Amino acid sequence: MADQASELEALELILTDANAEPTKLSYALIKSITTNFSQEIGLGGFGVVYLGVLRNEKVAVKKLFIEQDFSDELFVDEVNCLVRAKHNNIVRFLDYCADTQGELVKFDGRHVMAELRQRLLCFEYVPNGNLHDYIKGISHGDEWQIRYKMIKGICHGLQYLHKERITHLDLKPDNVLLDAYMEPKITDFGLSRLFDEGQSRVFTKNVPGTR
C-alpha cells in the first residue's frame, strides 16, 4: 500500500507539472484508480479507455488489445513517441504500465503456465467528449468562433506532430477530444505501429507511425 501511495502521489505531481516526464505505473495502481476497470469511457481500434480517479484529478487509462504477435519493442517505441509529443493541442501522455505475469490455465486436458501481458497508457482526462459527437449535436446557431477555434487548434496540433516527424495516420473527428474550454486535443496518433492490418480495424495499410 505504501508503494501505491507513493506512485499515486507521483502521478498527481505529474498532472500539476507540465514539464514532468512520464514514468512507469504498477498494474496494481492502475486497477485501483480505475476501480478494477469498472467505468468504460471509450472504445477504439487499439483498446478500451477507462476512467481513472485520483484524489483531486481524473485520468484516462487506455488498456491495449494484446494479441499473440503484439510487439513489446514497438510498444517501447510508441511510448517514446508519446513522451516526445508535448503541445497544447495534443492529449498529454502521463504514464504507462507494462505488466507480465504467469498464470496457470487448462489446455488440452492439463494445466500449463501461460503468460498474461497487460499494456496500458495513461493520459490526461479530457471532459467534453470527441469532435464527432460534438458535430452530431451542434445546432445551426453555434458560434463560428467556437468552430474556428477548433479548426485552428487541430491545425496547430497536426503541424506540431509533423514538425516532430510523427505521422498520425488516422486523423478523424473521433480522434479529436475537447477540453473544458472546447480546445481541441489530438489523440491516438502513432499506435498503428503496434498492430497489423487485421488487428487495428482502422487502418487500410500498415505504415509506421514515426520516422
Question: Where do the language-model regions lie?
Answer:
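Catalytic-loop of the protein kinase fold
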Residues: 166-178
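Helix N-cap/beta-alpha junction loops of NAD(P)-dependent oxidoreductase domains
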Residues: 194-195
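Membrane-proximal cytoplasmic juxtamembrane segment of single-pass receptors
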Residues: 1-154, 163, 199-200, 204-211
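Pre-DFG segment of protein kinase catalytic domains
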Residues: 185-188
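A short helix-coil junction within the Rossmann-fold of NAD(P)-dependent oxidoreductases
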Residues: 160
